[in-house]
Amino acid sequence: MGSAGLEQTKARLHINCAQPATRTWQRKFDDEGKKIEQFSMTMNDMISIIPLILKGLMVNADQMGKGRDIQYDPFRKWMDNCYRGLPIGGLGAGSIGRSYRGYFQHFQIFPALYEEKPILANQFSAFVSRPNGKSYSTVLSAPTADALKGVDKATIGSWDWKLKEKNCTYHALFPRSWTVYDGEPDPEIKITCRQISPIIPHNYKESSFPVAVFTFTVQNSGRTPADVTLLFTWANSVGGRSELTGNHTNSKMIRW
């Protein structure tokens, strides 16, 4: 369906992509959330899971003996955080997570490969210019200070990471979400990003497509026209010579 057909369909169905649903889960970008803490176990709990641990180790040893990568490594430290929003993608098609702070994280596309940290190259950015010469630009996400720590200032570190978090709100109602940038980067511009994954009632086949749609709506409340440019960047998500620069890895499930 072309852009004209899409607009006709939205008009017929009375879809306003810039308006979040009335009942949504909401978070401000500057919301620190509730930090995830490790739970403790009693001695009885530890004793009760010994058979499960032994079975898991036996399965891993069997997989390694057959030349396959193990599905779950109990000795690996998993990173988790409280910033997760809705996942992207259809049912059973793997997923790419998205934080309520605007960035992509928790990649789970290939079996046994989990990329939990945000890939900083995967971003939406906005550039605004007006006839009076004023211009504004920013990356439309707010990674934590830890995510930006150690980033090369000559590459991704040179991007405009100056989003005012208090002006941005995330709304979620599965399978949709809305990210509203009110006054960002231009004080008189409002940008709404609508995300939707293909969850179609009674249609499992097309609900399993590994796709998602992002629709942007820009509203100008100023008295002068604005030239708004949206940029989408994405690092190599499959592998190859550039995979390491995007924090990606290649791994064989079976050694031939």
Predicted features and spans:
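An acidic- and aromatic-residue-enriched active-site/binding cleft used to recognize and process polar
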Residues: 91, 98-101, 109-112, 131, ...
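Beta-sheet entry/capping signal
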Residues: 85, 92-94, 178, 215, ...
